[in-house]
Structure formats: structure tokens, C-alpha cells
Amino acid sequence: MKKWLWIVLLCIFVLIPGLSAAQGGKFILLASTIGPIDSGIVGALEDQFEKDKGIRVRHVGAGTGAALKIAEKGNVDLVMAHAKSLEEKFIKEGFGTERIPLMYNDFVIVGPAADPAGIKGLKTAAEALKKISGTGTLFVSRGDKSGTHMAEMELWAKAGIKPAGAWYVVYEKGAEGNVPTLRYTDSKGAYTVIDRATYLSIKDQIKLAVLVEGDEALLNYISVIPVNKKKFPRVNEKDVKTFVKWLTSPQKAQKIIRDFGKAKYGSPLFFPNSREWVKAQGGK
């Protein structure tokens, strides 16, 4: 993330009255990966939680890597992320307490309907990326260490490829999120890896089509991590515990997640995945 944006974010959290975690009370600060914000699920959860519990949640959006960096400064109470390796590192270094499963959706590989690389219908993302690389067809990456970028790089690794060359374009504004990245990809007639929720939210505004989907490697797990109060005493631990309990409840947020997007898109944008939800469905 650019240095000036870091400064703006820190000013928002530290200098503006009413937005400091140090004030405690009925207020939770959340640093969230951008995709769930763009889809509307974060706002829907925040609004219903405030109605149910009278506790306000406010968020700042950033790629997972940047969101975790904000939390490492102690400027938020909770993080919503989707990059397991970065999340585990964050916890191991003492910044967060635990990785709590919340929900999941999936990534898809999108590209022009004409499909110059010939990947449509391939069963695995690895096969598709090999063909894109092998044909030198334009591919756009966020390149910002966000959860989406980390997932993309894991897929390249599974394919045994280190992407580089004129065909592999790192979008200079990738840190702004998946929607701008998807629009840029569309303008270039290129391929990219994107979460399905983002694609569905603007599919009527772009020409790109979903070409590869359904590979287990494309699943996108989203979790929440409470920031460690032992490291940052000003963290609003009490209200975070209430929020996490509500988020993971099969009778509360998990039902909202289950149904979110059905009316508009004909299918949900996310699937509930808390331990409590899985247990209630007969899982382990």
C-alpha cells in the first residue's frame, strides 16, 4: 500500500474523535479484506449486530496483507481476512489470538468469452494457468499481497509456474480491491483470478465470463481474528467477544450469511462455515 494511504488510515483510526479503540465502550473497529465489503455482506452483518446488541461496528477495507498490517499497529479490534499463511503468521507473532472460521465462497478464473487461451471447461485451475502461460495470453494480477493475490500465487505454484513476462500484468492500482482489478481486466480483454461474489456483483457491467470453476483449490475461506489485548491494552476485547459469538452463531450471523445474495443473484454469495454452524449441520 502506498505510504500516503497508510498515513490516512492511521489518522482515521488514531486522530478522529470517536474512532479510536482506546475509547472502548460500545464500539468495535474492524479491518476487513475488501471483497466482503464490496459485496455488502460486511455492512449487512454490522447493521444487524447493532440492532441485536446495540454495539456499533465500523470497518476499514484493505487487502488482507494491509489489513493485518493495520492490526499490527493496534489500531483495530478485529480483522477479517482470507489468506491462511498470513493469518497464521499474524497469530504466531502475537498480534492476534486465534483464527476463527466464518464463511467461504470460491474464486473463479474469468476471461474474454472468445477465450483465446482455450481454458473454458478445464477441471483444474492449474491446467488453466498452464495454458494461459503457455500461450502468453494476457493475465492481470492484483500484485498487492492481498488474500486474492496470495490465492493466485498459490495456484501458480500448484501449476509449477513462476509468472513473468509481458503477458503477466500487475495492476498498479490492485490494492484498491477486486472490483477495480476486475474492471481493468475487462478493459484489457485479459484473464484473472477473482472471487465469485465480486464477479456476480458487476457481471452485468463487464464482458468477462467465468471460464474455470469448481476446483477445490479455488475455495476461498474467510476468517476473523481478534487482536491480542495483551499486546494492545486498548483493544475492545469485551465487545469483540460478543461480536464473534454472534458472528459464529448458527441462529444469528450464520443464517444471514447463508441467505445473503439469494434474492438478487439466485444463489448465495457466501456459505456459513463457523465451527458452531458445521456442528449444527451434523459435521465435526
What are these regions (language model features)?
Residues A21-D52, R56, G65, K69, ...:
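Exported/periplasmic ABC-transporter solute-binding proteins
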Residues M1-W4:
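Positively charged n-region of N-terminal signal peptides that target proteins for export
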Residues I7-P17:
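Bacterial N-terminal signal peptides
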Residues A71-E72, I100:
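Short glycine-biased active-site loop of nucleotidyltransferases that positions the nucleotide triphosphate
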Residues L78-Y104:
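Acidic, polar ligand-binding/catalytic clefts
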Residues I109:
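Serine endopeptidase catalytic core focused on the charge-relay Asp
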Residues Y104-D106, G136:
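Residue-level signal for tight coil/turn positions that link beta-strands
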